[in-house]
């Protein structure tokens, strides 16, 4: 009788092992994409960002212009730092217009900063101003952008200059870059010049009211 009971228990154990399926082992690679999908990275092509200098292109500036909305006078700026130095933002001076973007603070060598500006809504003035960056050699890089409201009287202009010592962008710097320091017309052409202090620049500015300005600063 005991042997019969034991045989019944053994048979029941074998049956349960066969009848119950083994728990499925789903590896990480085999899981549905809804479980394992990676978050989509946001584009870095936005005003206020710092990107690889080699990635700076007009397509990047086009995205910034789009993000600024349907404003008649606006500008997307990209400046590549190939100077061998680190830059730190000082400030922005606006002769006219404004920006919703914080000027990127730290721009290491081989990086480029992106910035956007526009005319003030409801005004009949353009987007005109100066950016200032202090460089690790103790000097300041001043950058002019000028996108006028009335193209019957004015044109697009840009400029770049190295100032000795630490300077802030202000009305004096604007007047110097716009009137006296050999500014470049925004005429859809590349312009190059020596900046002194072992540096040179190469830049391109479009001529329309939705303006792109790309500048590369490198060692001479």
Swiss-Prot record:
Example of a GO MF term: toxin activity
Cell compartment(s), UniProt: Secreted; Nematocyst; Target cell membrane
Stretches for region Trp-rich region, which is important for the binding to lipid membrane: 146-161
Site (described: Interacts with the lipid membrane): 201
Site (Important in the initial contact with the lipid membrane): 154
Propeptide: 20-42
Subunit (UniProt): Octamer or nonamer in membranes. Monomer in the soluble state.
UniProt domain comment: Composed of a long N-terminal alpha-helix and a core region rich in beta-sheet structures. Before the pore formation, the alpha-helix binds the lipid membrane, partitions into the lipid-water interface and stabilizes the monomeric molecule on the membrane. Finally, it traverses the bilayer, thus forming the transmembrane pore.
The protein's role, per its UniProt record: Probably acts in predation. Pore-forming protein that forms cations-selective hydrophilic pores of around 1 nm and causes cytolysis. Pore formation is a multi-step process that involves specific recognition of membrane sphingomyelin (but neither cholesterol nor phosphatidylcholine) using aromatic rich region and adjacent phosphocholine (POC) binding site, firm binding to the membrane (mainly driven by hydrophobic interactions) accompanied by the transfer of the N-terminal region to the lipid-water interface and finally pore formation after oligomerization of monomers.
Record-given protein name: Deep-sea actinoporin Cjtox I
Organism classification: Eukaryota, Metazoa, Cnidaria, Anthozoa, Hexacorallia
């Amino acid at each position: 009788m005991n042997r019969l009971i034991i045989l019944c228990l053994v048979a029941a154990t074998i049956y349960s092992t066969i009848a119950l399926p083994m728990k499925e082992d789903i590896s990480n690679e085999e899981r549905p994409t809804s479980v394992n999908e990676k978050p989509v990275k946001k584009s870095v092509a936005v005003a206020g960002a710092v990107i690889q200098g080699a990635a700076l292109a007009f397509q990047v500036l086009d995205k910034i212009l789009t993000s600024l909305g349907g404003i008649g006078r606006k500008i997307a700026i990209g400046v590549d730092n190939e100077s061998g130095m680190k830059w730190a933002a000082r400030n922005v001076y606006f002769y006219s217009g404004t920006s919703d973007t914080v000027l990127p603070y730290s721009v290491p060598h081989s990086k480029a900063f992106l910035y956007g500006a526009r005319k003030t809504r409801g005004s009949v003035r353009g987007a005109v101003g100066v950016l200032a960056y202090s460089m690790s050699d103790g000097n300041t890089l001043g950058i002019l952008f000028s996108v006028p409201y009335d193209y019957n009287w004015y044109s697009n202009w840009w400029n770049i200059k190295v100032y000795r010592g630490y300077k802030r962008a202000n009305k004096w710097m604007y007047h110097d870059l716009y009137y006296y320091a050999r500014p470049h017309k925004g005429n859809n052409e590349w312009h190059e010049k020596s900046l002194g202090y072992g540096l040179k620049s190469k830049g391109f500015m479009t001529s329309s009211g939705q303006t792109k300005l790309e500048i590369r600063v490198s060692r001479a």
